[in-house]
Every structure is written in structure tokens, then in C-alpha cells.
Amino acid sequence: MAHKKAGGSSRNGRDSRSKRLGIKKYGGEYVSSGNILVRQRGTKFHPGENVKCGKDYTLYSIIEGIVKFKKRGKLKKKYISVIKLNNLNKKLQNRQISIKY
């Protein structure tokens, strides 16, 4: 007869892999068509000009250009836009936007 009680097995020791969410391209960065700008759960960021939203709320660029972050509306929702390079030069000349490099 055994004099030691059998040790129980642990039920710990597992964890899920991280989902790598967050901003992938920041304001002022150059992006090409199809580049992922943000991976998110829900709409923390909303699509602006030249940006589309995937079925998992991923925001991606539909043209090549420069990324621009904006807050709009009463609730100050965050929008991400991509500005075409030739439009960017005109807007910079008219001082409508500022870009940090």
C-alpha cells in the first residue's frame, strides 16, 4: 500500500497568443495602396478619405500617399485619412495642413 497520496495535476499553464493590434502606420508616414494602417477591435479609429474598413475593423489605404490623423465632430471621433502626394503639395502651399516628418 502506498504511503503517499498521488499528486494532482495542475490546471494552469496555457495562454492565448497576442493579436498584434494597434497602429501600424503613423501620421506623416508614406503608404502605398493596400497598406494596413490600424488593426483594432471595433471602431476606435474611423476611416476617413481614401481609407476603407475591413470586416474585422482593420483600416487600410486604397491609394498611395501620406497618413493623416484627425478628430472630427462633437464627440471628437478619430479619423484616419490618406492624402495623395500631388494634393499634398497644393495643401501645403495653401497651409491647410501640417505634416511632421
UniProtKB/Swiss-Prot annotation:
Q: Name one GO molecular function term.
A: structural constituent of ribosome
Task: Enumerate the PANTHER family for this protein.
Answer: LARGE RIBOSOMAL SUBUNIT PROTEIN BL27M, RIBOSOMAL PROTEIN L27
Query: HAMAP family recorded for this chain?
Result: Ribosomal_bL27
> What is the recorded name of this protein?
Large ribosomal subunit protein bL27
Q: Which domain of life is it from?
A: Bacteria
**Keywords, A to Z?**
Ribonucleoprotein, Ribosomal protein
What's a BP term from Gene Ontology annotated to this protein? Answer: translation
Q: Where is this region: Disordered?
A: 1-21
Q: Which family does it belong to?
A: Belongs to the bacterial ribosomal protein bL27 family.
UniProt xrefs under PROSITE patterns? RIBOSOMAL_L27
> In its keyword annotation, does this UniProt entry include Ribosomal protein?
yes
UniProt cross-references to InterPro entries, sorted A to Z: Ribosomal_bL27, Ribosomal_bL27_CS
Q: List the disulfide bonds.
A: none
A cellular-component GO term for this protein: cytosolic large ribosomal subunit
Cited SUPFAM superfamilies:
Ribosomal L27 protein-like
One Pfam family, short name: Ribosomal_L27
> Record's NCBIfam families?
L27
